[in-house]
């Protein structure tokens, strides 16, 4: 069991997602792997990577019990392709994490369809761990892919 965290490749920092992970680290499966992108970060007990090849990225996602990612469509689709339900935090303009808030709509939509968890202080990681984390059957994945495609 492990946790995989991805901040994406945006040049803007995303410390808010890392703060969420740090607050929840006592209940997260170890080891914790972080694809940090351009965000400067290191912490004892975490294995960090600036960037990963697509194959390595998928390998980490596939092997992890918990996936915590930014709200970019590509990362979300990768998790859903693996039939996993990720914990997602949208990058926000007001924190200078992105140029706009386009990730918010996608995250809200997917949460309403119960395909993702939204990263918040109220999220109970122990309950996430106790749920079956493979949530998508083939037909619902096709439907969801069409929804995302229309959105982006």
Model-derived regions, located:
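Nucleotide-activated sugar donor-binding and catalytic core shared by glycosyltransferases
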Residues: 1-152
């Amino acid at each position: 069991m492990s946790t995989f965290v991805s901040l994406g490749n945006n040049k803007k920092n995303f410390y808010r997602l890392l703060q969420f992970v740090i607050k929840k680290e006592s209940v997260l499966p170890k080891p914790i792997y972080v694809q940090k992108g351009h965000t400067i970060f290191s912490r004892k007990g975490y294995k960090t990577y600036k960037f990963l090849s697509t194959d390595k990225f998928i390998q980490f996602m596939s092997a992890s019990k918990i996936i915590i990612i930014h709200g970019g469509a590509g990362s979300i689709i990768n998790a859903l392709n693996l039939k996993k339900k990720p914990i997602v935090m949208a990058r926000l303009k007001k924190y200078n994490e992105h140029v706009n808030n386009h990730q918010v709509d996608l995250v809200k939509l997917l949460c309403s369809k119960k395909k993702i968890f939204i990263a918040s202080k109220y999220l109970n990681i122990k309950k996430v761990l106790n749920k079956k984390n493979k949530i998508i059957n083939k037909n619902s994945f096709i439907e969801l892919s069409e929804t995302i495609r229309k959105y982006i």
